[in-house]
Design a protein with these regions (language model features):
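Preference for bulky hydrophobic residues occupying beta-strand positions
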Residues: 182, 274, 313-315
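Acidic-aromatic/histidine active-site loop/patch
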Residues: 267
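A conserved regulatory-domain signal marking ACT and ACT-like small-molecule sensing domains
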Residues: 285-316
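Single conserved hydrophobic/aromatic residue that forms the stacking wall/gate
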Residues: 1-8
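Nucleotide/pyrophosphate-binding catalytic subdomain
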Residues: 8-264
Length: 316
């Protein structure tokens, strides 16, 4: 049996929670593939830094220094002083130097192509995944080698058949604990870095889970699962224990930003249950998403979500 765990949507992996991530990963006895996202806020900082550089704003260097600081301090916080920490700092430093050179190039030519932008944002997951791999003792695998996209109508979309084949080949002999950067992919023809879209780490985990017929997909984020309503609006909102794939998809499409909507299709097709849990409250029940729901407390209205000027009431 294989469990695929997405540890943290991008907003979840914060400096304060990374040791919680370690405990979550180490709690699994069976083989586990862990997919991680960038440290919280780093993807936005990467995008902002690149735009500042392209606009000729020299203060992009200050923004970049914050990115460097976050990762360097993270390593000092979670990896004990010694040879392992020094080696990791060197490895992360090399990636950060690559990134620095890219930003300097953008600043000099005052241009930011989509290709360069895709390369830049990939560093968020590459950096965080290497740190978490060291922290958890997991074997690091480069998702750029097996998550493949193709260009259709000027957009990069997943090549499912090729990706499934490469995932099965890559993990034909599965180590006890595997660490994979989410979100990142490459063009199957050119090898250029692409990505699966914001929230794509969820999708990466689902793709791998489906390709390997995993026993389950766990998504560890910063909420207790799907709620009956937005708790910031409805104070009495509570966690929904079970949802069907269809119900979860509808809620996600109408504003419930718990799971990236494309995540659900690959595992739905294979009838692999999704468990959504809170990194900061691992003892919480969370929400199970599966084909058939057997919630004895089912009510006429399961949950309410909304987007601007639009609302969805989900009835049974």
């Amino acid at each position: 049996e294989i469990t695929t765990r997405l540890v943290g949507s991008e907003m979840c992996i914060r400096d304060s929670s990374i040791l919680s991530v370690k405990r979550i990963v180490e709690a699994v006895d069976e083989p586990v593939i862990v997919v991680v996202s960038a440290l919280g806020g780093i993807t936005d900082k990467l995008i902002n830094t690149s735009r500042m550089a392209a606009a000729g704003d020299a203060s992009y260097e200050n923004e970049f220094r914050e990115i460097v600081y976050r990762h360097v301090e993270m390593i000092k916080e979670v990896i004990p002083a010694g040879e392992a920490q020094v080696a990791l700092q060197r490895q992360i430093g090399e990636l950060l130097n690559e990134l620095k050179d890219i930003f300097q190039g953008i600043y000099l030519i005052k241009d930011l192509s989509q290709k360069t932008s895709d390369t830049i944002v990939s560093y968020g997951e590459r950096l965080s995944s290497i740190i978490v791999a060291q922290l958890t003792g997991a074997e690091w695998f480069d998702s750029r080698k097996f998550i493949k996209t193709e260009k259709k109508h000027s957009k990069h979309v997943l090549d499912t058949e090729l990706t499934n084949s490469l995932v099965r080949e890559t993990f034909s002999s599965l180590p006890k604990r595997v660490l994979v950067p989410g979100f990142i992919s490459t063009d199957k023809m050119t090898g250029e870095v692409t990505n699966l879209g914001r929230g794509g780490s969820d999708y990466t985990a689902a793709i791998i889970a489906a390709a390997l017929d995993a026993d389950s997909l766990e998504i560890w984020t910063d909420v207790d699962g799907f709620m009956t309503a937005d708790p910031r609006v409805i104070s009495r909102a509570y966690t929904i224990n079970e949802l069907s794939y269809v119900e979860a998809t509808e809620l996600c499409n109408f504003g419930a930003k718990v799971v990236y909507p494309p995540t659900i299709y690959p595992v739905c097709h294979k009838n692999i249950p999704i468990l959504v849990k809170n990194t900061f409250n691992p003892e919480g029940v969370g929400t199970v998403i599966k084909r058939e729901v057997s919630d004895p407390q089912s009510k006429a209205i399961k949950g309410i979500s909304s987007i601007n000027d639009t609302s969805l009431i989900l009835s049974l």
